[in-house]
Structures are given as structure tokens and as C-alpha cells.
Amino acid sequence: EIAPRAAAELYSLLCDAMVAADTKAIDALLTDYCVLTHMTGYPQPKVEWLGDIANGAMRYHDHEVVSVQPDTIAGFPVVRGRTRTTATLWGGRGTWNLQIVGYVVPDADPDTERNPTGFRFSRLDASTW
């Protein structure tokens, strides 16, 4: 189980790194096998997602955190974060009420400079709320 403070910090680090287009920081928050499932249903491997951020195909301009809650789904610890996010995704710009459910695992290779939480996301599921 992830403590509320660590959950909020992990989610905040992810949102801030997305807006900064800091792919190294995002990488430090995700496991090697992490997949982001977009609200369209497209499952995007981490390497592809980070590539799209690096080349500007996906630009996160701003976010306002509305809520961050630790939770469990089928016994797995998750962080359920809700933001109002402005982004340009593959050419289309908009502002969305974005929910990301991040499945959390202990960090087997801690990078305390970029990720001091002791956890990483192994899966991210995006939807609207």
C-alpha cells in the first residue's frame, strides 16, 4: 500500500515532468515495462510515449491538480489522480478533465534525485472524469 503523502508526491512529480517535457524525470517514475493506455484505448509503451513527448507530438502545456487518492484495484495499490490538463496531442489542442490511474510498485532501483518516493508506476490508465 502507498501512503497518501507518497501517492501525492509521485503523481505531482509525474504531472510536473509531463508539463516540463522532462523525459528523464518521467522515465525515473515509470518501470521499464510501463504502458500508458490513452483515453482512446490505445496502449502506448513507455519508450514510444517518451519519444512522442521528446519530439513534440505530445505537449502538455499546463495542469491543475484537482485530487490525488491512494486506492486499490483488485488488490493492487494505485494512485487515482484527477487534473484539468491542457495539452496538444498529435496536433489537437484542448483542455481535459484528465484522470490517470497509476498502478504502483516498489522502486527496485531508486533514483532519489528524480524520484524520492520509493515507488514507480507500472501502468497508467488515462480517462476523463
Give residue ranges: language-model regions:
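A generic structural motif
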Residues: 37, 86-88, 105
